[in-house]
Amino acid sequence: MACKTCCSKIPCFRQKKTVLVTGAAGLTGNMVYKKLKERSDLFVARGLVRSEGSKKKIGGHDDVFIGDVMDPKSLAPAMKGIDALVILTSAVPKIKPGSGPNTGKRAEDVIDSSFQGPMPEFYFEEGQYPEQVDWIGQKNQIDAAKAAGVKHIVLVGSMGGCDPNHFLNSLGNGNILVWKRKSEQYLADSGVPYTIIRAGGLENKAGGRELLVGKNDELLPTEAGYISRADVAEACVQAVQFEEVTKFKAFDLGSKPEGTGTPTKDFKALFSLVTARF
């Protein structure tokens, strides 16, 4: 089919975007990686993981690179030639031994809106503290992407950054939201076109809810302060696809409770509601 805007009979093809997802072995990162691969008519997917074991865990495909976000040089091969970067690396608190029945498990596998009972104690593994992963590691990714000429960076953060006393900062004494906010500001000041998605409380449930955007943690104390990982992953993919309405924007992302509202289908319209740059 010829392009309607020219006289040529040569077919017009939409150029695929090459998109790298870091943290591709994580719960949300892997969802984004898989969604990109499923839409091979629009995207060429790449993933970045920390180890050979993590690569095998998600299929061991040639489009999965191994790199350490604390080692900027190791990021260059994965960044080469990409159009967009989706940052989904994050420090992961784990439950302290002897602190409840889920000893050793990651907080994200246990704690969500349905959690009941006394809150256990948490810790971060050596070398995996929020200052290292959510600040220095994300800064390294932003710098590497900028050096590689990346045209768009989507950074997934968290709601709660406006409150220094938010309970997430107390987990393992990591101040995780403080460091996340610092990397968000660094990205906003980097000069690289960006989209910052501050997700609400993450739930390990099916997606397809009605999504809501906000700012300054206004959704956090409401019933819209939670969102499924699947919906966050979908928002990341859509943010890359509709970059014309997501670049240089930052927003909170929540959802109506499960079983209520109308599932969001028009992401371009949703993103067009956002006016905040940070």
Model feature map: region roles:
Residues L85, L187, I197, V232-C236, ...:
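Non-catalytic, hydrophobic alpha-helical segments
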Residues D41-F43, K146-H152, R181:
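A short helix->loop->beta-strand "cap" motif at the edges of active sites that frequently abuts
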Residues G137-Q138, W179, I197, P221-Q238:
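Substrate-positioning beta->alpha
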Residues M1-Q15:
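N-terminal chloroplast transit peptides
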Residues H152, V156-N173, K182-L211, E218-P221, ...:
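Conserved beta-loop-beta element that borders a ligand/cofactor-binding pocket
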Residues V19, N30, G47-A148:
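NAD(P)H-binding glycine-rich loop region in Rossmannoid oxidoreductase-like domains
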Residues F13-L42:
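N-terminal Rossmann NAD(P)H-binding glycine-rich loop of SDR-like oxidoreductase domains
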Residues S228-A250, G254-E258, T262-F278:
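Alpha-helical substrate-binding/gating segment
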